[in-house]
Curated annotation (Swiss-Prot):
GO terms for cellular component: cytosol. Detected in adult pancreas, placenta and fetal skin, and at lower levels in lung, thymus, prostate and testis. This is Ectodysplasin-A receptor-associated adapter protein. Residues 123-202 form the Death domain. The keyword Cytoplasm applies.
Length: 215
């Protein structure tokens, strides 16, 4: 009763072997970190975040089109090159040579201060611009256009001196051409005609009679 039979002993010895065979047949998961890194790199490639090398930079630079090629391409498409050289300035009239003696080169543009030296002309302008008529623009409109305040206009009207003369004195640095523009603006063709005649006829005589003004 206490002794095991051969069959019973065989069963006892086969149990461990059967368990060992079962363990060998089961797949064992590979946990080697080196192998895992290679497998992951195949599925998910790692991006290179390093700066490009000098050779790569040179290659990129060489592959870029030159400025001349880009300019020619823009011209072929019919569009001007906006990044090119700035447009040249409008050519001026070079018909007059150096030391030219024509009237347009010798004469400077007269100012109102030059006009104030001609008493006869001042009298004519004063007679035309001093009177106050409801439908005619006079010195008040001229002075207001050039920035004179309402209080100043009223003050000049109260003075015994001609308000037109005061207006011209305060704007003596302006040109006679600017004064003629005011005449055209307010439809005072009569005053503009007087000024135009003085600029074309009297002013050249006065300017040429004093050569020291050119130096």
């Amino acid at each position: 009763m206490g002794l095991r039979t051969t069959k019973q002993m065989g069963r006892g010895t086969k149990a461990p072997g059967h368990q060992e065979d079962h363990m060998v047949k089961e797949p064992v998961e590979d946990t080697d970190p080196s192998t895992l890194s290679f497998n992951m790199s195949d599925k998910y490639p790692i991006q290179d975040t390093e700066l490009p090398k000098a050779e790569e930079c040179d290659t990129i630079t060489l592959n870029c089109p030159r400025n001349s090629d880009m300019k020619n391409q823009g011209e072929e498409n019919g569009f001007p090159d906006s990044t090119g050289d700035p447009l040249p300035e409008i050519s001026k009239d070079n018909s007059c040579k150096e030391n030219c003696t024509c009237s347009s080169c010798l004469l400077r543009a007269p100012t109102i201060s030059d006009l104030l030296n001609d008493q006869d002309l001042l009298d004519v302008i004063r007679i035309k611009l001093d009177p106050c008529h409801p439908t005619v623009k006079n010195w008040r409109n001229f002075a207001s256009k050039w920035g004179m305040s309402y209080d100043e206009l009223c003050f000049l009207e109260q003075r015994p001196q001609s308000p037109t003369l005061e207006f011209l004195l305060r704007n003596s640095q302006r040109t006679v051409g600017q004064l003629m523009e005011l005449c055209r603006l307010y439809h005072r063709a009569d005053v503009e005609k007087v000024l135009r005649r003085w600029v074309d006829e009297e002013w050249p005589k006065r300017e040429r009679g004093d050569p020291s003004r050119h130096f």
